[in-house]
Amino acid sequence: FCACVYAGAWPVPLPLPTTFGGKDNYIDQLAIQLMSSDPKLLLYPEEIAEMAAAAAARQGCAAESWQDFARREAPEVTLPEASPDDICYLQYSSGSTRFPTGVAVTHRALLHNLYGHAETMNLGTNDRCVSWLPWYHDMGLVGCLLSLIANQVSGDYLKPDAFARRPLA
């Protein structure tokens, strides 16, 4: 996520298959989100390679595992300078009341949100966060990942599907 923003790309955090009840449903959902976000490249964890490749192929989108992408030689490029009103990332709604909708979040909006977290939660470097929220979810991404980075707070993360199945384990 951070590397995409740094490079001037718009990361689009998308859910993993555990939330859709089956391989075909996940491929369908992912293909629709790819169509609406029109990415240049879909990066995915190797364990969902077959589903990610199928969804990307439907949309004519390049796809590569994070692991393969990380092995690429870094090109020599000049990184873009972001302006406050440039888009920072795309965030999809959960789709609990209708189909997930993509929302463009600017750098300014994200920084205001992070500032609000720091001020209202009085975060300090001795604080620690434990979260099971997935990073494609707004509270998981902003509240439990980016806010921790911005405020130098330590975090421990539980796998969302494992926590949902056995929250007291």
Which role fits each region the language model picked out?
Residues 1-6, 24-28, 133-150, 168:
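Conserved coil-to-alpha-helix start sites within the AMP-binding
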Residues 111-128, 138-169:
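Conserved AMP-binding/adenylation subdomain of ANL enzymes
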Residues 63, 73-92, 98-99, 113, ...:
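Conserved pre-ATP/AMP-binding loop-to-beta segment of ANL
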Residues 13, 42-43, 130-131, 156-158:
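Short catalytic-loop micro-motif centered on adjacent basic/acidic residues
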Residues 94-97, 133-139, 161:
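Active-site segment of SDR-like NAD(P)-dependent oxidoreductases
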Residues 6-73, 80:
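Structural core segment of the AMP-binding/adenylate-forming
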